[in-house]
A protein has these predicted regions:
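S-adenosylmethionine/decaboxylated-SAM
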Residues: 1-154
Length: 154
């Protein structure tokens, strides 16, 4: 969820030991043609499907189950994407969420966070709480870089 210019999708397609099909979602119109061109240059356009639109809406249209979901989209929306992510995540599937510690801001008081970032801060804290207290998931929060979570579906 969140393609940007396609770097992560290409990396996963290139190094997955088992040939897989990757579905990725992007909403920012300027990045979409760049990602498509990058997929083509990497020779991965047949392996990577890029769905255009708001992830909250696109996720609702997806069917089946996914063994692995990588979330690197609008940080304030992670909590809103989660119900659909859980619907799609296979049993024993893995959810990786990137940038969850927001440069360390997530552990700060909301008053220490700049006013314009308070909503993202609040939602990310709610997201982390939900992941770590969910009966459906086992989650580890890794303080690497900007923070990452690894969640496995029970």
């Amino acid at each position: 969820v969140g393609t940007a210019v396609g770097f992560s999708a290409i990396l996963m397609a290139e190094y997955d030991p088992v040939p897989c099909q990757i579905t990725t979602i992007e909403n920012y119109e300027k990045r979409i043609p760049i990602a498509r061109e990058n997929f083509k240059r990497a020779g991965k356009e047949a392996q990577i499907a890029l769905l255009e639109g708001d992830a909250a809406e696109v996720l609702k249209t997806l069917e089946g189950s996914y063994d692995f979901i990588f979330m690197d989209a609008a940080k304030g929306q992670y909590i809103h994407f989660l119900p659909e992510i859980l619907r799609l995540l296979a049993k024993d599937g893995v959810l990786v969420s990137d940038n969850v510690l927001q440069d360390g801001d997530v552990i700060e008081s909301r008053f220490a966070v700049t006013r314009r970032n308070r909503t993202i801060h609040k939602r990310m804290r709610e997201y982390l709480y939900t992941l770590t207290h969910s009966e459906e998931l086992v989650t580890a929060v890794l303080p690497v870089g900007d923070g990452i979570t690894l969640s496995t579906r029970r």
